[in-house]
Amino acid sequence: GETISIYYDPGKFPALMPLKNGNYEERNGGVPQRGNITIHLQQFNEDLDKMTPDKNFGGIGVIDFERWKPIFRQNWGNTEIHKKYSIELVRYEHPKWSESMIEAEATKKFEKYARLFMEETLKLAKKTRKRAKWGYYGFPYCYNYTPNNPGPDCDAKAMIENDRLSWMYNNQEILFPSVYVRHELTPDQRVYLVQGRIKEAVRISNNLKHSPKVLSYWWYVYQDKMDIFLSETDVKKTFQEIVTNGGDGIIIWGSSSDVNSLSKCKRLREYLLNTLGPFAVNVTETVN
């Protein structure tokens, strides 16, 4: 769009792509330490030209890359395969090493090249679309209300790791934390989830010389119940948390599956007109 462009999995980041039979296929080496940066950047440049041909694009550019995290430890769940594969590569190369030595080497190699890919991608975006404001979706991560960290505060290790990602944040004009809430949480927990994530993003921003803006990704359905729109109370309280804790704005996100039928379109239109729209206007006027 003219105001905001979201680039989903752009370029050719190294990744292990899941196949229908349960196996994985290597894309550009599979993991950062085996990837070809030139191939990736060439493809990323082509993707930019295709999606945003206007070199004077002055809007917001969001790079939405979620195949793996640049912090080795944080690759769990869907991204854990990259961690396991990296460990196996070192084990194959050094069969006599201890497990701790193998993991340390895998961590070092992975994080070195993960940084290379993510940093050079940002730099190329900024070089070719100088007027746009760039950043990666989801960062900084907080991991509050997760199985290993069930409270409102961000995971202590993740906060230290966020400080280690200053190389990324120094190249971003905007931070894009995700504040999607879950139905399984209590109303108060939903508020605290948003509060914790905004506070961490603002903390990171305040620690940087150029103080990037904090624009939160907010979804109008519950992450674990995608057929239920956020209640009026949840809309009001989550918006208020973003504003009162130092957030600079909100990106209201939606999935194509939210509008893939006539009945869904009608439901969303009604929700926008009666619930979300009026409150969004109210918050905008208050902030301005």
Curated annotation (Swiss-Prot):
Gene3D superfamilies xrefs: Aldolase class I (3.20.20.70)
Catalysed transformations (reactions): Random hydrolysis of (1->4)-linkages between N-acetyl-beta-D-glucosamine and D-glucuronate residues in hyaluronate
Tissue expression per record: Expressed by the venom gland.
GO biological process: carbohydrate metabolic process; defense response; hyaluronan catabolic process
GO MF annotation list: hyalurononglucosaminidase activity
Enzyme class: hydrolase
Residues modified by glycosylation: 36, 282
Subcellular compartments: Secreted
Enzyme Commission (EC) number: 3.2.1.35
Disulfide bond sites: 142-154
GO CC list: extracellular region
Record key words, sorted: Allergen, Disulfide bond, Glycoprotein, Glycosidase, Hydrolase, Secreted
SUPFAM superfamilies to which the protein is assigned, alphabetical: (Trans)glycosidases
Active site: 66 (proton donor)
Further remarks about this protein from its record: On the 2D-gel the determined pI of this protein is: 9.5, its MW is: 44.1 kDa.
Similarity comment: Belongs to the glycosyl hydrolase 56 family.
PANTHER family membership: HYALURONIDASE (PTHR11769:SF35)
Purpose: Hydrolyzes high molecular weight hyaluronic acid to produce small oligosaccharides.
Designated name of the protein: Hyaluronidase
Organism, scientific name: Polybia paulista (Neotropical social wasp)
